[in-house]
Amino acid sequence: MKKIGVVIPIYNVEEYLRECLDSVINQTYTNLEIILVNDGSTDENSLNIAKEYTLKDERFILFDKKNGGLSSARNVGIEYFSGEYKLKNKTQHIKENSLIEFQLDGNNPYNIYKAYKSSQAFNNEKDLTNFTYPNIDYIIFLDSDDYWELNCIEECVIRMKNVDVLWFDHDCTYEDNIKNKHKKTRMEIFDFKKECIITPKEYANRALSVGSRDISFGWNGMIDFNFLKKIKLKFINFIINEDIHFGIILFASANKIYVLSQKLYLCRLRANSISNHDKKITKANVSEYFKDIYETFGENAKEAKNYLKAASRVTTALKLIEFFKDQKSENALAIKETFLPCYAKKALMIKNLKKIL
């Protein structure tokens, strides 16, 4: 039975987190290893809710870290499953129905304060000292204000044989202050009505035929974890729209992509998500990793976000140019020719900013 690694970043989602986590623990497919990454939440209950679910389900491990943005939280999951962290138990004795505390021993690039796991996962004190990362077959990301259909993992796993990536469709729920409601999903724009297996070149050709340059990938499906480790792909830190760079390199490196037109993911579009900043930001609630830019722009959230968006595009374009220098395969070249000019052109929009750091 294949083991699935689930990575869930958490940031100020006390209103939505239970619905998200309930959709995970009630999946019809149960062989899961679930990482919760609290990215410096400042609300009252996000961390407490995460601890509650970690306590009652031994499949969970919770990392509590300094705020660093969505990319850093997802990368904690990738690095943990890759065996890049050594955990040292802070808790010396097991108490029934309690959380065992761990600290990172050595390399700690994302300033992880503590890790927590349920006492149910350990039989004795020796288990504490021998605790290590699980070996997973596939990895999938879920944003903590969203949720899955209860058959999501099962539908993915049965289709992952001999493919590197599975891409599924999603549905959206909208908050009242979100504009552009009820837009078509990328799956609908690309007109994939039936499930199929495609090559990256075929994806690029479909993108050209429908006039779309959308190739983002974060929570959009499942990834073969050995493939992900082989290509050494992670999310770029301290940018927004990090799933564009991730998606382009993921697809350019893949051989086969499974297209599943089922809407298995429920995406909640709201203003103050982990990946979004808007005019409602104040000095009191601005996230830590965004604070320097916010203050540089005189606490003008709109200008600060415009800069972050432009700088993110430049960073993305430069990283993509560097990646494609050494790519010779037909699939990679098709992705490059279809998508790189678009994102390089967007990067040049930084020259239109009124104020540059």
How would you describe each model-predicted region?
Residues 1-290:
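Nucleotide-sugar donor-binding/catalytic module of glycosyltransferases
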